Amino acid sequence: NQKMKDKVLLVIAKQHDKIVAAALNFIGNDTLYGRNWGSIVDIPFLHFELCYYQAIEFAIEQKIKKVEAGAQGDHKIQRGYIATSTYSCHYINNPSFTDAVKNFVKMEAKEINKQIEIINQLGSPYSNQNN
């Protein structure tokens, strides 16, 4: 009987009482999923504060086990995230284009899996290598 509002975390940045940026997160059973971010200003590191640091802080406070920061971004590794596969679903209403996208995604997936393996062999910069 949960309501959607109980499953959403919206992190907002204000400047002079005006909303200038926000990050949208969804709260799962044991995972906080970061999904969308937007800003109308260019403030250094604001993206990291809203999308990563505030999300991690919320997850710790709420005892949420994982923060899934979404697809792409080598910069996430420097912030303690490990490389993982993520999935999405798209509908393309053009059979020729659908085939082209399918072929590209198959090739891309092989390369991404190689990159994930290489990155994870290096380990998280915050892991305790002695354990």
Regions found by a protein language model. Give the residues of each.
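Acyl-donor binding region in acyl/amide transferases
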Residues: 29-95
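Terminal substrate-recognition subdomain of acyl/acetyltransferases
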Residues: 66, 72-131
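A sequence-composition feature that detects small, non-aromatic residues
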Residues: 13, 21-23, 55, 59, ...
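A conserved beta-strand-loop-helix scaffold within acyl/acetyltransferase catalytic domains
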Residues: 1-44, 106, 123-131
